């Protein structure tokens, strides 16, 4: 079916993951006072842009996708869909998404999404992924944009809460991506993609995974110390971070099967970030300085 091909080229799994984090950022900022139309416009607009980026990424990556067992059945590699059709599909989705964000949210949220799109398509996909071991680091910025955009769609400003979300989700991307690179090591090696495990070895990647999880754990609790989230969120953040760290440290055991271990680290990374996105939504709080700003605004407009 033609529809199925057009859907597959947009990587629905990635869209769904970004939708969850965007909604988490939005609801964190909304603090229970939800503008449902704005939420719908934000997540739909963002999802369309993410779908656009994924479709264009498929066009860019089809040569290396043909070399990787995991991606050899993608529609552009098999010829089930033409590059021209996929590119046109991506452009239309992107234009629709940006139009929805521009007219229904605010310039800051739209600008955040544009930043993420340019980083993912223009910097990561076109150059860094193929040429630098730091491609994962650069790509992590685009992966951290959805919750920030969701947050800024509500607040209209880039404040400490937005900065914490950017840091937190960027740090999460690193062990998540390195774990993929370890259990898909042969694929990345065959395609000549300079990810850390291929360039510097699996041991170096394991060390980086542990360090980034520690940094991520510290970043997650900053939402609580900043007054943006409550103790329910804190309990989940501490529990998931510690379990993820324990799992990562188990990779140093002599009898460890690196591929199986990396899969566990990868799958738990998804559980971790999904749990935190949900808890941000249900246990968000208004920090004192934001309450002061809102009180001042209410006095000004009253």
Swiss-Prot record:
Its main location: membrane. It is found in: Cell inner membrane. Gene3D superfamilies: UbiA prenyltransferase (1.10.357.140). Its EC number is 2.5.1.141. The keyword DNA damage does not apply. GO terms for biological process: heme O biosynthetic process. One of its GO terms (molecular function) is protoheme IX farnesyltransferase activity. InterPro entries: Protohaem_IX_farnesylTrfase, UbiA_prenyltransferase, UbiA_prenylTrfase_CS, UbiA_sf. Keywords: Cell inner membrane, Cell membrane, Heme biosynthesis, Membrane, Transferase, Transmembrane, Transmembrane helix. The keyword Glycosyltransferase does not apply. Carbon 2 of the heme B porphyrin ring is defined according to the Fischer nomenclature. Converts heme B (protoheme IX) to heme O by substitution of the vinyl group on carbon 2 of heme B porphyrin ring with a hydroxyethyl farnesyl side group. HAMAP family: CyoE_CtaB. This is Protoheme IX farnesyltransferase 2. It comes from Chromobacterium violaceum (strain ATCC 12472 / DSM 30191 / JCM 1249 / CCUG 213 / NBRC 12614 / NCIMB 9131 / NCTC 9757 / MK). The lineage of its organism: Bacteria, Pseudomonadati, Pseudomonadota, Betaproteobacteria, Neisseriales.
């Amino acid at each position: 079916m033609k529809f199925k091909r057009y859907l597959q080229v947009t990587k629905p799994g990635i869209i769904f993951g970004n939708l969850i984090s965007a909604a988490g950022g939005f609801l964190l900022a909304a603090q229970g006072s939800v503008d449902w139309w704005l939420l719908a416009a934000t997540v739909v607009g963002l999802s369309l842009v993410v779908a656009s980026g994924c479709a264009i990424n498929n066009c860019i990556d089809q040569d290396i996708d043909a070399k990787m067992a995991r991606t050899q059945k993608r529609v552009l590699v098999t010829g089930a869909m033409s590059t021209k059709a996929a590119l046109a599909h991506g452009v239309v989705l992107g234009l629709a998404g940006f139009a929805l964000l521009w007219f229904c949210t605010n310039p800051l949220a739209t600008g955040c999404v544009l930043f993420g799109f340019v980083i993912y398509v223009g910097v990561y996909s076109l150059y860094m992924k193929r040429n630098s071991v730091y491609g994962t680091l650069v790509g992590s910025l685009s992966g951290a944009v959805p919750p920030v955009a969701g947050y800024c769609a509500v607040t209209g400003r880039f404040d400490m809460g937005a900065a914490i979300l950017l840091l937190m989700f960027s740090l999460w991307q690193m062990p998540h991506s390195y774990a993929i690179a370890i259990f898909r090591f042969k694929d990345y090696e065959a395609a000549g993609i300079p990810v850390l495990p291929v360039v510097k070895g699996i041991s170096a990647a394991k060390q980086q995974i542990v360090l980034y999880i520690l940094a991520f754990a510290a970043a997650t609790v900053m939402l609580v110390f900043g007054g943006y989230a409550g103790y329910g969120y804190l309990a989940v953040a501490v529990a998931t971070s510690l379990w993820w760290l324990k799992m990562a440290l188990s990779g140093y055991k002599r009898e460890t099967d690196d591929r199986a271990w990396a899969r566990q680290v990868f799958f738990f990374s998804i559980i971790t970030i999904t749990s935190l996105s949900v808890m941000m939504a249900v246990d968000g709080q208004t920090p004192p300085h934001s309450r002061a700003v809102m009180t001042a605004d209410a006095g000004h407009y009253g």
